[in-house]
Amino acid sequence: MEPDKDAWGTSRHSRLFPGPWLVHADLHNHTTLSDGKGDPADAFASMRAAGLDVAAITDHSRWASVAAGLVAMPGNSGIDRYGWEAAGRIADAADEPGAFVAMRGFEWSSALYGHANVWRSARFTDPLRSGLVAMAPFWRWLERHGEDGLAGFNHAGSAMLRFGRFRHRPAVAERVVSFEIFNKTNEHLLLGTERGRPSALVQCLDAGWRVGLLGVTDEHGSDWGHPEGKGRAGLYVHELSRAGVYEALAARRFFASRVKGLRLDAALDGVRMGGTVPVRGGPARFAVDLDRAGWTGRRLGVQVLRSGPGLPTLAAAVEVRVPGPDEPPVAFEADLGGAGGWVVLRVTDPEAAADPPATGQWAGLGRALAYASPFWLVPDGR
């Protein structure tokens, strides 16, 4: 099924690229299988009723393996073998290809290094078995026992050691697909910079990780999918199935949002977000497809972010107006100031207050609404 409009009345079709179409997803949720408050049997129905097309249960894995599967462990210890199997049964029962995708995953939850989601894997692990005092054991698990999994960095702005300062691991880099830029109601672009730490996004991308940008609710309550203002994601899929979702994640063909029913797509010199762009010199041309029911004519800001010392460099900031269906998509040019590296587009509401700890020019840009996945710049080989 490929419906023309989503639950909020927004067209699912990008005006920039044919083919894949938009589905709304929340890929990070908790239940009583770990430290959530809601029955896992109710989670997928709640998210489907809330208008989501794709949902995942990703309960914490912590230290339940200490029991070696001999007895069931309490939820605050994270999932054990019994919880992992139960999550799989619940997801399989809720999954309806073509109508709604239900997925099982887990959140590897280290108090020191941070939290990472893993989807698609047949197995799970926890920090007690893979990473109590280092990141390397988790990466090795993902290489060997979790070789079928896709992974992502969760709420990295608040992580203590930030995955070992995001030290790059080439063997798993293609399967580490995401970075949560919105988690719950928090934006993780500047979180931690008020304490002198670098932007987690800059730190991650500069380390060489080619991740797309996700929004997630990280829901721990029992109203999955319903609260306003929490993160969510838009994926462009070829089919509404688990395979279609995994393909879109692997292609980094997705965006982060904290607004329900938003469509965002972006191109840099004709290359879609998440792609590699040859740099030919001169101004770069951006095209942005923005739409939401009732937003025609609304004033928004679009910022072009590049690497910088600690904080992102603001390469450009433009004011745009959401076009109507008979008007061309937003387009503008910007000087990227050098070849190589990465580019991220950020969409803001200039009339709403920026999230703490934004100060200076960042405070003046307003509240972040969405992010496109990064573009990766490479020298033109012609």
Label for each model-derived stretch:
Residues 1-382:
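Extended, charged catalytic domains and RNA/DNA-binding interfaces, predominantly
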